[in-house]
A protein has these predicted regions:
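Metal-dependent enolase-superfamily TIM-barrel catalytic cores that perform enediolate-based chemistry
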Residues: 139-196
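Glycine/Thr-rich beta-alpha phosphate-binding loop at enzyme active sites
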Residues: 148-173, 201-253
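Catalytic cores of alpha/beta
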Residues: 135-145, 195-212, 251-258, 262-264, ...
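Alpha-helix-loop-beta-strand connector modules within alpha/beta enzyme cores
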Residues: 110-128, 170-189, 234-262
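An N-cap/entry alpha-helix motif that binds or orients negatively charged groups
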Residues: 1-58, 62
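Hydrophobic faces of well-ordered beta-strands that scaffold small-molecule active sites
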Residues: 44, 66-69, 94-98, 125-130, ...
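Acidic (Asp/Glu)-rich catalytic clusters
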Residues: 56-60, 84-91, 114-122, 140-147, ...
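Active-site cofactor/substrate anionic-group-binding motifs, chiefly glycine-
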Residues: 56-103
Length: 273
């Protein structure tokens, strides 16, 4: 029990440091959307006032093809952060994903910052989040914790390598994802955390039954910079540009299959990002 508490406290501190370090981060990478041009249609043949932005996502109708993606949870200040984010999601009727729930799955004392999202959103579309090493039971518990409509399985090898306490062995993750997809009844979304998903990886995921990919491309939150602030021994400035830019990752993944459902995230700051 003492060992579990110690691990939970380390995780909680790390999550707090992630927010603090993000806020003091200075590095800006680009997501390549500046190289994307939408073709102008001079003959749209539509009535602007008939445009309907609603769509069905994970079995629920949402008002816009937008979502508040996974950010945080697992420390005291995260309760207020997630509460405010959930209010925004509710006001616009868009989905919200929570940050990694691994800490709360292991220790119920840390559930509050995740459960607050469901408390605020009530019937809204909430998505769970946990790592690629999670067991089927852990995934199920993460979903049940917030009555989620689906679950994100996040992939973050670049971040882990830059963490002093991070994982170094990534063997078996694909097989584990395949097992989760087969045994979990809710939709499973495989998500990168800011370094993009390549065409090759998208193809491998599709082959094991993954239907939803969140590309999480380069251009937004930079976890190499965030972890660099935390690492007392090494600074990773030469790797701050690491990753597949969001726009490029989107094109690569879409080329795999028109049936693959893609969430495009990574530096989406404004319209025409």
């Amino acid at each position: 029990m003492e060992e579990l508490k110690a691990k939970s406290e380390i995780r909680s501190l790390r999550k707090k440091e992630h927010i603090d370090n993000f806020l003091q981060g200075k590095f800006q990478s680009d997501n390549y959307f500046q190289y994307i041009y939408l073709e102008h249609n001079a003959l749209p043949e539509i009535d602007f006032y008939e445009i309907d932005t609603k769509l069905n996502f994970l079995g629920k109708t949402i008002s816009f093809p937008l979502m508040i993606n996974a950010m945080t949870g697992g420390f005291q200040r995260a309760v207020e952060i997630n509460k405010n984010l959930a209010k925004i999601a509710g006001n616009f009727n868009i989905p919200m994903a929570v940050g990694s729930q691994a800490i709360a799955v292991a220790d119920k004392d840390y559930e509050a910052s995740f459960k607050v999202v469901r408390e605020v959103l009530k019937e809204g579309l909430v998505i769970s989040n946990i790592n690629g090493f999670a067991t089927v039971d852990q995934v199920a518990r993460a979903i049940d914790m917030i009555e989620a409509y689906g679950v994100q399985i996040h992939l973050n090898p670049a971040q882990e390598i830059c963490m002093t306490e991070g994982d170094r062995n990534f063997k078996g993750v694909l097989k584990n994802i395949e097992n989760i997809v087969r045994k979990i009844e809710k939709p499973v979304i495989v998500k990168e955390v800011g370094f993009g998903i390549s065409q090759t990886v998208a193809k491998r995921l599709l082959e094991v039954g993954v239907k939803y990919i969140d590309i999480g491309g380069r251009g937004g939150t930079n976890f190499i910079e965030i972890e660099s602030w935390r690492n007392e021994h090494f600074h990773f400035e030469e790797l701050f540009q690491w990753g597949i830019p969001t726009a490029l990752s989107l094109l690569q993944c879409r080329a795999i299959s028109r049936d693959l459902k893609i969430i495009c995230s990574g530096g989406m700051k404004r319209a025409g990002t």
